[in-house]
Amino acid sequence: MRTIKGEYIVEYYENGNICREEYFLNGKLHRENGIAYKSWHENGNIWSEQYRLNGKLHRENGITFKSWYSNGNKCNEEYFLNGELHRENGIAFKGWFENGNIWIEEYWLNGKRLTKEEFENRNNSSSSCNPEGKIVEIDGKKYKLSKIAT
């Protein structure tokens, strides 16, 4: 059974349990302050939750996409920004086997997958900055930076 109210849709399984809820704007999954798509397994356990803006997976501060196995165990958690896997302070994609053991953890920035080492070293100033020759001003005096042998 399907119930449509404006751009909000609810579907039910034949057994009467809720199947899914969807929020739309201009034909695209969209909800600014909440979950745009939520689904359940036929047994009534939650299946997935998705935050979307204009059809794209998007959430600035939190998990964007979550899913669970029919037994209630977590399946995956994903962080998206503007439709791309992205998380600046940790794992962006994490998945579990049905028994609850972790099977994958991935780091992503702006849709690009990074190794754990690349992610942890991305702001390492020693590898990305060469200040030699730069002029700095301290208390009105200018100084030219140079490398000191160690």
Task: Report residues per predicted region.
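Glycine/tyrosine- and acidic-biased, solvent-exposed loop/turn segments at the edges of beta-strands
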Residues: 1-142, 147-150
